[in-house]
Amino acid sequence: MDLITVAELHKPKRLICKRNLLPIDNLKIVFREVRDYFAGNVTGITRDETIAQNIMQLLFCKVFDEKSKNEEQLVDFASRPKENVNEFAKRIHKLFNVVKEKYLDIFDADEEIEISPNDLSVIVRKIEYYSLINAQRDIIADAFEELIGRAFRGGEGQFLHHAMSSR
C-alpha cells in the first residue's frame, strides 16, 4: 500500500477540539511508537539526536497548542477531514514558527521541522487525540527519558529533563 492510500485510510472522521483530547496513562508506549516510526520510515533522519530534535519540536508544538486553546477551539496539532497533507504540513510549520518565537531560548530562529508532509501526518496522528498537558508529570518525564534518553544522556548516564516536562 502506498503512502497516499495509507494517508487516505487514516484521514480523521471529525475535527478535534481541545475538549475532545483524551487523558493518557502511558505516554511511553505512544512516544516509543513515534520514535520507532522516525527511525524506520523518515528518510534522512536516522541518528538518535536528529530524531530527538524533530520529536521535541513536535512535542513543543503539541503542548503549546493545547495551552493556547480554550475547550471549544479546534486544535491546530491535528489532521482535518477535508485537508490535504500539504495544507496540513503548512499549518504545523506555521504553528512551529509561533513556538520558535515563544521559546527563543530553546529553538534557533532558522530551525525547521525536517519531516515530509506524509511522515508528519502519520506522526501527528499518533498523538493528536491525547492531551499532553493533562498527563501526570512523572509520566511525561518517563516518556521523555524513553524517547530521547539515548540522544541526550550525559557521560555519566544522567538524564536532563527538558523544560517542557516541568510545570
Which sequence ranges carry the predicted segments?
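Alpha-helix N-cap/helix-initiation sites
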Residues: 45-53, 133-137, 158-159
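Charged, often flexible domain-edge or linker segments that flank or initiate folded functional domains
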Residues: 1-101
